[in-house]
């Protein structure tokens, strides 16, 4: 079973909600002081996990490199904000797949993905939502924002998108159970996604309908550009472990971009498939 540590921010109501949900019915086993973090070890329903408070805003948590030396996977528990205030439960890899880094991290640097863990979390979010009849969208988000790559696979799990939802105990429990599911996920086929909007609807549908398909990085339409496509492609493929296929939603991608993607895929000995093929 993997050693998974959850980073939560005491100043973030959704993050606090998720952390409290995780520990409510869990047994505390141990506490360990590291240089920057105090890590608690808990067990719930036979699943062991580790929990520690962040030093500040999660998207700026560059000290997480210390955790990467000790744990297999880092999960960032966070709120999600949007202009539409849409109720949502989301997972995504952090990173900046463009030359801009407005919200933490470094330009054209992404974190190492955890496709299997994210897929297990996504499926559990949907299962719990459907079972409880919750009014939330469940989806991947595309790769965006910091922190810098800590050196271990990581992902964000988020509750959106306003104060009422951030403190919703059912949403907190959904995320808690999703994190537990990600501790020991089943084998998957890791892929990289290109195209689509911020909430990656076509890629999410493909992952939910194809049990083996598990996305790492997803690069949306608005983050693709000829000027840096080669560097971006290398970064997201290299940091999606064991990815052998690139899944493309090309409905709004320039034909020239798709042709360049085909060349890059061929040069790496990978396979390019349309998202509609894999659903």
Curated annotation (Swiss-Prot):
Catalytic activity: a D-aminoacyl-tRNA + H2O = a tRNA + a D-alpha-amino acid + H(+); glycyl-tRNA(Ala) + H2O = tRNA(Ala) + glycine + H(+)
A GO BP annotation: D-amino acid catabolic process
Needed co-factor(s): Zn(2+)
Enzymatic class: hydrolase
Region described as Disordered: 86-106
GO molecular function terms noted in the UniProt entry: D-aminoacyl-tRNA deacylase activity; zinc ion binding
Disulfide bonds: none
Cofactor binding, per record: Binds 2 Zn(2+) ions per subunit.
EC number: 3.1.1.96
Pfam families tied to this protein: tRNA_deacylase
Keyword terms: Hydrolase, Metal-binding, Zinc
Function (record text): D-aminoacyl-tRNA deacylase with broad substrate specificity. By recycling D-aminoacyl-tRNA to D-amino acids and free tRNA molecules, this enzyme counteracts the toxicity associated with the formation of D-aminoacyl-tRNA entities in vivo.
Summary of subunit composition and partner proteins: Monomer.
The family this protein is said to belong to: Belongs to the DtdA deacylase family.
NCBIfam families: PRK03995.1-4
PANTHER family assigned to the protein according to its UniProt record, in alphabetical order: D-AMINOACYL-TRNA DEACYLASE
Protein name: D-aminoacyl-tRNA deacylase
Classification of source organism: Archaea, Methanobacteriati, Methanobacteriota, Methanomada group, Methanopyri
């Amino acid at each position: 079973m993997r050693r998974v540590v959850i980073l939560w921010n005491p100043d973030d109501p959704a993050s606090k909600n998720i952390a409290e949900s995780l520990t409510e019915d869990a047994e505390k086993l141990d506490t360990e002081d590291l240089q920057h973090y105090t890590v608690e070890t808990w067990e719930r329903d036979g699943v062991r996990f580790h929990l520690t408070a962040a030093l500040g805003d999660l998207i700026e948590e560059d000290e997480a490199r210390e955790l990467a030396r000790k744990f297999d996977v880092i999960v960032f528990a966070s709120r999600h904000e949007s202009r539409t205030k849409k109720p949502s439960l989301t997972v995504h890899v952090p990173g900046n797949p463009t030359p801009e880094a407005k919200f933490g991290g470094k330009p054209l640097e992404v974190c190492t993905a955890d496709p299997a863990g994210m897929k297990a979390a996504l499926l559990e979010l949907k299962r719990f939502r459907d079972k409880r009849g919750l009014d939330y969208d469940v989806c991947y988000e595309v790769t965006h924002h910091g922190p810098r790559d800590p050196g271990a696979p990581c992902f964000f799990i988020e509750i959106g998108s306003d104060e009422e939802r951030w403190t919703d105990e059912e949403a907190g429990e959904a995320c808690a159970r999703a994190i537990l599911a990600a501790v020991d996920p089943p084998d998957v086929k890791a892929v990289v996604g290109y195209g689509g909007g911020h909430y990656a609807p076509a890629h999410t549908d493909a992952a939910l309908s194809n049990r083996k398909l598990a996305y790492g990085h997803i690069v949306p339409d608005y983050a693709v550009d000829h000027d840096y496509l080669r560097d971006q492609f290398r970064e997201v493929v290299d940091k999606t472990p064991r990815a052998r296929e690139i899944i493309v939603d090309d409905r709004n991608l320039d034909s020239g971009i798709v042709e360049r993607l085909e060349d890059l895929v061929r040069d790496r000995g990978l396979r390019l498939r349309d998202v509609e093929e894999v659903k």
